[in-house]
Regions:
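NAD(P)+-binding Rossmann beta1-loop-alpha1 motif at the extreme N-terminus of oxidoreductases
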Residues: 1-75, 79-80, 148-149, 212-213
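NAD(P)-dependent Rossmann-like dehydrogenase/reductase catalytic/cofactor-binding core
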Residues: 2, 226, 230-293
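Short, well-ordered alpha-helices that flank and scaffold nucleotide-derived cofactor binding pockets
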Residues: 30, 34-38, 62, 99, ...
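Small-residue helix-packing motif on alpha-helices
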Residues: 47, 57, 217-225, 250
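Rossmann-like NAD(P)(H) cofactor-binding subdomain of soluble oxidoreductases
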Residues: 60-64, 73-153
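Internal alpha-helical scaffold of NAD(P)-dependent oxidoreductase catalytic cores
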Residues: 123-134, 150-188, 201-241
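Short pre-catalytic strand/loop immediately N-terminal to key active-site residues, enriched for Gly-Thr
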Residues: 136, 185-191, 247-252
Length: 293
């Protein structure tokens, strides 16, 4: 290839390049970066991260040597021309993180994807002292760390189908997604899938302790609880995906009248297990609403 042709090719690559900025480089951002890089290898993507913690920045650079790290907000200029910006800081740090970046022009054209808990699309615009921004709000969960997330997505009225597809492709790189029609549903998603892994871990803890109390050592009890939960979840997924049994039908198939499973489930039912789960989810939803005020 001649020098002029090479220059033209480089310019075209730069024009077609998807330029992504992460503001914040914590665990969820790390999971997303890893998923995007692993699943979008054929695409021309450049990822930069603004991370003020030197420890976190060094960890990110070691894990992903191909990304660019900014340690200070004033290192970022309009020349960077980001077209997708992930907000990935703690809620209490968002206003301070955005304040020095308000003056930059790319906010008006970029797709903003926020994984900041409790921060509405309107609040984000207020922090940026701007209006009519394209914002997709996301509630992922920690299984994103192994590309098994369940994420709820809401797009404000300024987001067109092209940008919705872009957000969908990026978030699908770390798991499953569900589009929401109402921003208030983010609070419900937070209660079910956002906090849901903790409910599963709590049940695993309880099952492990029950096994230990029956004479199994710690590692044996851990294996029994974990493989039982994993196997049951995969069996349920197989059935749901193939249109066979639902959760209730699967439970009923394990439960013989007058048998051991029936005896255990009877204790759950008598102690209002389903009601307890619902109350716990409602408490999480209400707390999410409060954090968003």
């Amino acid at each position: 290839m001649q020098p002029n042709q090479q220059n033209q090719q480089n310019q075209q690559n730069q024009q077609n390049q998807q330029n992504i900025l992460f503001i914040g480089g914590g665990n969820m951002a790390t999971a997303l970066i890893g998923g995007i890089l692993a699943n979008q290898k054929q695409q021309n993507i450049k990822i930069s991260v603004l991370e003020i913690s030197q420890i976190a920045a060094k960890s990110l650079q070691k894990k992903f040597p191909e990304i660019t790290i900014f340690s200070f907000a004033d290192e970022i200029s309009n020349a960077n021309n980001f077209d997708t910006i992930f907000l990935a800081v703690k809620p209490q740090n968002l206003a301070d993180a955005l304040q020095p970046l308000q003056k930059l022009n790319f906010w008006q054209t970029a797709l903003i994807i926020s994984i900041v808990a409790g921060m509405t699309t309107q609040k984000i615009q207020t922090f940026l002292n701007a209006t009519n921004l394209k914002i997709v709000r996301v509630m992922p969960n920690t299984p994103a760390l192994i590309n098994q997330a369940m994420s709820g997505l809401f797009a404000n009225a300024n987001v067109d189908e092209t940008n919705k597809n872009l957000a969908q492709n990026l978030l699908s790189s770390v798991g499953k997604i569900l589009w929401l029609n109402d921003e208030n549903q983010i609070d419900a998603i937070t209660a079910i899938s956002g906090s849901g892994p903790a409910y599963v871990f709590l049940f695993l803890e309880a099952l492990q302790k029950a096994a230990q109390n029956m004479g199994f050592d710690n590692k044996q009890a851990e294996l029994l609880a974990l493989q039982t939960m994993l196997g049951a979840a995969l069996l349920a997924k197989n059935n749901i995906d193939s249109g066979k049994d639902n959760f209730a039908q699967l439970r009923q198939k394990v439960t013989s009248k007058g048998g051991t499973t029936a005896a255990a489930l009877d204790v759950f039912f008598k102690n209002n297990f389903e009601n307890l789960v619902e109350k716990a989810c409602q408490a999480a939803q209400q707390r999410s609403v409060e954090l968003g005020k």
